[in-house]
């Protein structure tokens, strides 16, 4: 009986903590919509204090850093977020977003091999996002893999990304 009671209490506290994190993230999103990135970052940090494995908070903070051009802080945070959330994949789509942001940073540093590796991982976690296939196609093309580029473009088109069709018509005929 005591074990059941402890289990039920644990589940209740977990649900309450998740609801608290979601409210904090929503407040941060509202601040961000008003372009108050400082307040948004503060709220996203607060969400990580409540739940250090909140992939969504890592993604939101990283997005702000990238938009500010602060790639080194974004990369540090993404590495930590991926390391922490990989073992407890609560939200595969959000974790895949962490990989896609990191791939963008690798791309801007012209580290195409790592960019492709991160996009590969993003696709493993979320096979339904056509943008990941499109991004990987562009990186593959820049890296000289035209066949791989065209294959990824076909997948992006199949998933409904119209921009991939234009690029495919230009480079894959």
PLM regions: where:
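Alpha-helical tetratricopeptide repeat
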Residues: 2-6, 15-173
